[in-house]
């Protein structure tokens, strides 16, 4: 069965435009929910020992520090609180000691993480540089490998992938940390590979079918690669579902964001990059 993807290209334009608009607006007015490793602060994962020691009781005890408390894995509780920008190492350690004294023997500590504001700022800069470097390198790779409509289509869809991934973190409020950087770079790498495979097949068919209309040729090429695309996407998504369900609270955000990047990467590979390519009329017979 042949699917006519180009028939619905205008709908795909509207969907992608709406997603980009939502992403940009969310980034402008809501921003990103920076994690402790970027914003600086204290993160503690604890498990109550005493019967009836609830998250509400813990929140009341720690109210003077204005913490964020989150239930994870049924029993464990994640405690997060910021630190003043000028906090010294001694002050940071003192704050941890104060919290431990308040909680007393009511909890067990699974993880304690302290990130100073200075280190957090350096990590933010490092993360931004990593993303910019990856984007530039991928853009150069695309430009060297392709020319004309191919390069423009891959470049625009690649940029769209970045915008949508940042928008996803902003809209959902998922913690933006070093893991998020890894998710974005991994997802974009997956997406650009998918685009290259599809473009290679289109390029082969352009040389093979000299008189076939461009829309039909793109549909043919996508259908020829669809089984490979779907097998790769579905198998990776199933792995993410497994991580989401059984990997614990610390991996759920990773699985959710990675799953979104796979879906969006597949969408932009099939529609956005190919729609832009279609508008370039690669052959004289298509004019």
What is the meaning of each model-derived region?
Residues 1-287:
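A structural signal for conserved, well-ordered secondary-structure elements
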């Amino acid at each position: 069965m042949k699917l006519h993807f180009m028939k619905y290209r205008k709908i795909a334009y509207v969907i992608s435009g709406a997603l980009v608009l939502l992403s940009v607006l969310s980034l402008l007015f809501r921003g990103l929910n920076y994690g402790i490793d970027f914003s600086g602060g204290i993160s503690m994962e604890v498990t109550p020992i005493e019967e009836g020691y609830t998250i509400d009781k813990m929140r009341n005890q720690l109210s003077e520090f204005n913490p964020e408390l989150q239930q994870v894995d049924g029993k464990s509780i994640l405690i997060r609180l910021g630190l003043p920008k000028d906090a010294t190492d001694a002050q940071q350690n003192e704050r941890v000691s104060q919290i431990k004294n308040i909680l007393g023997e009511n909890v067990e500590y699974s993880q304690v993480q302290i990130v100073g504001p200075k280190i957090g700022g350096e990590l933010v800069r490092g993360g931004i540089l990593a993303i910019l470097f990856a984007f530039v390198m991928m853009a150069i790779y695309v430009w060297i490998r392709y020319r004309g409509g191919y390069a423009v289509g891959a470049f625009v869809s690649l940029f769209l992938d970045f915008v949508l991934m940042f928008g996803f973190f902003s809209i959902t409020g998922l913690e933006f940390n070093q893991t998020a950087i890894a998710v974005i770079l991994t997802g974009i790498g997956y997406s650009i590979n998918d685009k290259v495979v599809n473009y290679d097949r289109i390029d082969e068919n352009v040389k093979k079918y000299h008189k076939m209309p461009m829309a039909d040729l793109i549909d043919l090429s996508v259908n020829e690669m669809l089984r490979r695309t779907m097998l790769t996407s579905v198998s990776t998504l199933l792995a993410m579902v497994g991580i989401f369900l059984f990997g614990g609270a610390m991996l759920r955000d990773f699985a959710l964001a990675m799953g979104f990047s796979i879906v969006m990467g597949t969408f932009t590979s099939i529609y956005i990059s190919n729609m832009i390519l279609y508008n370039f009329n690669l052959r004289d017979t298509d004019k």
